[in-house]
Amino acid sequence: MAERVSSGDRAVDVSIVLPIYNERGHLRQELDRITLAMDSSPYSYELVVVDDGSTDGSLDELRQIDGIRLISFVHNRGSGSARRAGTRASTGRVVVWTDVDMTYPNDDIPQLVKELEGHDQVVGARTSEEGTHKFARVPAKWFIRRLAMYLTGVRIPDLNSGFRAFRRNVAKQYLHMLPPGFSCVTTITMCFLANGYSVKYVPIEYHERAGESKFHWYRDTRRYLQQVVRMIFMYNPMRVFGPLSLVLLGTGFVKLVWDIVDKSQFRVPVNTALLLFTGFQVLSIGLLADVMSRSGRQSQDQEPATR
């Protein structure tokens, strides 16, 4: 039988981090569901609940619940800030991220933790899209996911699922990079993949959320895209600078040959020279950025999981 720890005085197997923002109507139901599942598992665990400045009485409700570790923000700071604070306060060898809005199969958390064996992160890949603003979210998420796959060179079935488990000792070196909003889940996925850590995907059912969605389709989609581009420049800048420099150098070389053949004399026009010079400049910047990126990662000493 599992043991739940609420004091944070000693380490546990699993820390479940729950960001809360105006979820009073279904808060207890979700916490009861998680508790029932974990009590039936072999894992000792803790519930780290972060109230993100709720205004509907969620914090008052949480203060009446025994057996949880509660962190509360005075003002709303965003899902990423809540997850970061909860993860930093965690003591578990494994950290689970999920939501309490009835969308994720929280009774499957023990199975999610079990799937982590031999991997550094396990992500619940949603098999359907039940979120709001589908007309905008579906194509935007497809494009951003393809961009992330280009960076990492790895197939990513679901880039921004909020249902995941990971090794805390690996994740802690990237917590400072998490943005305050929803794109924190994208960031933690790409940080693991870009640095050679193993990420496994398991299919999950995804349900319509209870209560009001906090996702703003334009603002949060823009932030997702910005975060992916930021990750590209931080971890694999040659993915951008390499192709761009090749296009410039290739175009410049073809034009140089054409100029020589067309005019029967070796004289480099200004526009041709500009193409070649710009191509070399872009390539040089890319190589320098790549060296800096690799140097910055040498201090990371957490070994990937082994089978």
What are these regions (language model features)?
Residues 23-38:
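Short, well-formed alpha-helical segments that are part of the catalytic scaffolds
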